[in-house]
Amino acid sequence: MEDLKSIIRNIPDFPKKGILFKDITTLLGDAKSFQRMVDLLSHRYVGQKIDKVVGVEARGFIIGAALAYKLGAGIVLVRKPGKLPSQTRSKTYDLEYGTDTLEIHTDAFNKGDRVLIADDLLATGGTMAAVVDLISSMDVELVECCFMAELEFLEGGKKLPEGKVFSLLKF
């Protein structure tokens, strides 16, 4: 895993001073590394029945679509308000300075679907907790929340269901 971690570029003071941003575009842009990352993540779920993979806007779309393809599952998009064309349900959640809202189509799942939620990075866990809450009343089974990378020191996993979090790379 160290080889994949080393490809992720560190950008100091982005998006604001004091933050060391993990730029995953360097890994995504390297074909062999991207393929290896998708293979490693998907391998965890081979043999489990995954009906839908939920991709969280925006980089979660990349990870989610690749995993859905590898697992033979459908892809469901969770987006910011006003981006989905049909009837939606929404979840507003707190940020450090304000709130944000996510939406999902009301007909995104079939009853009893086994769902994997995918995103690029687990930081504080606020966004993923909102996604878990959003789908929790949709009569589906959450298999796991999976991430390409996690910033462990932010302890975002504590906001998510116990035993339902997997991160390939940990910083």
UniProtKB/Swiss-Prot annotation:
Record pathway: Purine metabolism; AMP biosynthesis via salvage pathway; AMP from adenine: step 1/1
Enzyme Commission number: 2.4.2.7
Gene Ontology CC annotations of this record: cytoplasm
Gene Ontology annotations of biological process type: adenine salvage; AMP salvage; purine ribonucleoside salvage
Enzyme class: transferase
Record localization: Cytoplasm
Function statement: Catalyzes a salvage reaction resulting in the formation of AMP, that is energically less costly than de novo synthesis.
Family (UniProt): Belongs to the purine/pyrimidine phosphoribosyltransferase family.
Assembly and binders: Homodimer.
Name used for this protein in its record: Adenine phosphoribosyltransferase
